[in-house]
Every structure is written in C-alpha cells, then in structure tokens.
Amino acid sequence: GYMDMRECHEGTRAMVGRTAPPSGTTMKHLKPKEAVEFLQKHPQAVFVDCRSEMEYLFVGHPVGAQHVAWNDGPDWEINPHFVGQVKKVASMNRPIVLICRSGHRSVDAGLALEKAGFAEVYNVVDGFEGPLDDKHHRGTLSGWRMEGLPWEQL
C-alpha cells in the first residue's frame, strides 16, 4: 500500500508493532509526563533528542534536550557517530532519556546505546509529536507537545 515517504525513514522494523522489547534489553519506557518527572528527580540524567536537525530546529524540541541525530537527511542514513556523540554529552553510567518524533527511532537508538555499554536507557513513548491520527496529523493524539510539556523552537 501507499506509505507516506516521511514514514519510510523510520524503517520497516519500526512499522511492525513491537509487543515485547527485544531480549537482552533493559530499556525502560516512560510516558512524556513521566519523563519530565524522572528528569527533575535525576539531575544527572541526560535528555537526548535523536530526531533530525530539521525536526529539532523547526518542529521544536523539549526544553533541556541535547540534540544528537540517530539518522538524518537527505538519505536518512543511520548516524555512525551517534554513540560517540552521546558519550561526549554523557558518561556511560548516567541515565539517558531518548525522545524522537513518535517513539520508534528512539528505541533503535536506545538499543545501540545499550550495546555500547550504557547501563540505564529510557525511551519516551509517543515521542515529541505522537502517532498520526486518522487525518494524518501528528500532535493531536499524544506526545510531548500535545501534553503541554515545555518545548521551544527557533
């Protein structure tokens, strides 16, 4: 069937409903409001927005999030330096909270961090904009922005 091109770059793996987390992962999942509470309680945690630079700048991003793209345009290739760039902003023993647009890329990014030895990885469920509604709009069903949590854009 026809698939919106913007959907494609998240990969077909993300399109299959992930019921159980892959084995060997200790990743935890937080709803946006839970993520805010977690970050307030754990000042040592590092909040990473792993969307593309364009999304981060122009769609807006959560206040306090560091930007490290998991994949970026024009070809949406995986950023080979992702883990190294996260290591620059966070040590391996600090909790990492990951957010993307709707919660798919952040799971893949989180698995890569776990493989690299990060002990405490959290994924923000529904991401910044949430899933598409029946009118193909994001930001109406769930997600960071719809829940009225602090965000900014340029």
Tell me the role of every PLM-derived stretch.
Residues 1-45, 53-95, 106-154:
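Rhodanese-like catalytic fold shared by cysteine-dependent sulfurtransferases
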Residues 49, 103:
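Conserved G/P- and acidic residue-centered "switch" motifs that form tight phosphate/ATP-binding loops
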Residues 98-99:
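Short, surface-exposed ligand- or partner-binding patches at beta-edge/loop junctions that are enriched
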